[in-house]
Structures are given as structure tokens and as C-alpha cells.
């Protein structure tokens, strides 16, 4: 396992404006802009090395006693959702905003999202079209047995654990919520691909629905105006997301908080950023001075 700095070089570009004739070569003093670290974990569960993009909040000091919430981000590659979600976390944790506590973000870089984020399907066409699918059980074992213990050992985290997933990532986050809910205590589920296996996950039994379930969990489910899912049998993304919210809201447990957020101005491609921004307002309660 090794840690490498993520370095972004901010290239200064200038043009001649109002007679200004500064020579770029003489005045340019580029410096690295450090956003976080790149870490690696060797997974026995997945039989591969996984890249972790990690944002550490301002003031993070390995030598002090402060511990931080951790936000796990699916599709967390640098060219996916890591950078803009880190921006939301940093912005919302500013001293004059304090919507979100200063947090560590762990972006799990993608290798094969269809393999990692889907459970086995009974739909023949999907098996043939996407032959690597159906191994979410291994990815969940990786998260539970390897990733979370690694983060616990190597970074200063407290007991607050959030997962963010969109599309197939939202499907996986939903599967974890229903099958292994105590892995996280905050779930941000966006445009979940509940059409997978003809919506079978909506019929999944779960202990979170029982009155005996006694762990506090906050759940945000966001969806845009997205229409028909890519299935042979007609399914509507908005309808499935609402059905999921209603299923969880019907729980007999008093320890669940469920927020359903319909964003008709957003579609499947644009919803992620605004939805996470909304989720932070709903599921984080910060005492403001």
C-alpha cells in the first residue's frame, strides 16, 4: 500500500488586455495545488489492487487527537465524481457555513462498475449484454472486511460513515442498505438503477423494516426526470426511486430517517452534484453558533 500526492498544476493563462503586455515566461510561478492523496489497497476479496482517492480536510494532523467523519464515494476516480464531490464537502464545511462537519472523503476508483455494483440477474438479455455483471457480493465483502478496516487503521476517523452512490452505484448502496445496513449510518442514494433484475431489489426483505432494528440511519434518495429505464419490461426510474422511499418509510423501526427528493429540472446525467448538495442539507444536522 502506498500513498502518492494528487497534484494538480494550475496553469496560468493570460491574454493581452487593455495594452497589458506581461511576459508569461517571466512572471509565471506555477506551484502544485494539492487536493489529497492517492492510496492503494491490495484486495484478497477482489483479487486485485484498488486505488483510493482520499481527501483530508483542512487542519488534518496525524499527530493530534481529532477524528473525522468519513464519506465513501462510489465511482470515485479523479475523472468521475471525486473532484466535484470533494468540492461540495469542502464548501459545506467552511467555518461560515458549517452544513457538513469537516470530513475525510474516500473515493473508490472504478475498475468494472457493472461487475462490482450488480447482483446476479435472471434477465437473459442483460447477462448476454453485460457478461461481467453479478459480483456485488464480493465488492461488499471488500468494503466490509478490507476497505473499512484499512481506513480505520490508517486514517483518523470517528463512527460516522456515509456512502454516496449514483445509478449502478445507487443500486449497490441500496443493496448494502437492505442487506448489511450497519456498514454505514448515512446513505446518499441517487438515481438508483433499481430496474436491474426487473426491480427484484424492491422486493428484498430487510431487518431495517423491523421494529427491533435499533441503529440510527439517515437515508436520502434523490432522482431526476429520467423516464424509462433500459429494460425490456417498462420501468420508470422516478417510480422505482419513489417505491424504494415508500418501502423504507413503512419500516416499523423508529431509528430510520428517510428523505425523498424529486428534482424534475435534472436528468440522469446532471443530477449527481445538486442531489448531493441537497442531501447534505437534509441528513447532516450541525449546531450553528
Model-derived regions: residue spans:
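Bacterial Sec-dependent N-terminal signal peptides
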Residues: 1-26
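Non-catalytic cap/lid and distal C-terminal segments of serine-dependent acyl enzymes
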Residues: 21-289
Amino acid at each position: 500500500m502506498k500513498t502518492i500526492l494528487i497534484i494538480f498544476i494550475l496553469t496560468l493563462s493570460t491574454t493581452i488586455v487593455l495594452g497589458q503586455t506581461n511576459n508569461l515566461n517571466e512572471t509565471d510561478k506555477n506551484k502544485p495545488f494539492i487536493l489529497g492523496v492517492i492510496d492503494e489497497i491490495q484486495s484478497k476479496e477482489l483479487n486485485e489492487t484498488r486505488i483510493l482517492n482520499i481527501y483530508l480536510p483542512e487542519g488534518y494532523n496525524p499527530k493530534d487527537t481529532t477524528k473525522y467523519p468519513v464519506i465513501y464515494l462510489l465511482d470515485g476516480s479523479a475523472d468521475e465524481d471525486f473532484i466535484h464531490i470533494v468540492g461540495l464537502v469542502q464548501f459545506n464545511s467552511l467555518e461560515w457555513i458549517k452544513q457538513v462537519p469537516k470530513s475525510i472523503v474516500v473515493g473508490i476508483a472504478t475498475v468494472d462498475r457493472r461487475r462490482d455494483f450488480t447482483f446476479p440477474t435472471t434477465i437473459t438479455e442483460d447477462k448476454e449484454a453485460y457478461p461481467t455483471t453479478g459480483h456485488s457480493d464480493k465488492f461488499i465483502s471488500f468494503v466490509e472486511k478490507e476497505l473499512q478496516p484499512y481506513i480505520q487503521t490508517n486514517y483518523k476517523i470517528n463512527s460516522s460513515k456515509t456512502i454516496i452512490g449514483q445509478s449502478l452505484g445507487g443500486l449497490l448502496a441500496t443493496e448494502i442498505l437492505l442487506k448489511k445496513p450497519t456498514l454505514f449510518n448515512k446513505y446518499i442514494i441517487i438515481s438508483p438503477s433499481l430496474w436491474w433484475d426487473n426491480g427484484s431489489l424492491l422486493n428484498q426483505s430487510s431487518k431495517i423494516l423491523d421494529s427491533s432494528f435499533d441503529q440510527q440511519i439517515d437515508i436520502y434518495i434523490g432522482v431526476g426526470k429520467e423516464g424509462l429505464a433500459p429494460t425490456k419490461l417498462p420501468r420508470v426510474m422516478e417510480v422505482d426511486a419513489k417505491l424504494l422511499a415508500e418501502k423504507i418509510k413503512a419500516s416499523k423501526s423508529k431509528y430510520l430517517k428517510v428523505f425523498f427528493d424529486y428534482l424534475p429540472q435534472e436528468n440522469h446525467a446532471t443530477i449527481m452534484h445538486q442531489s448531493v448538495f441537497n442531501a447534505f442539507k437534509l441528513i447532516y444536522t450541525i449546531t450553528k453558533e
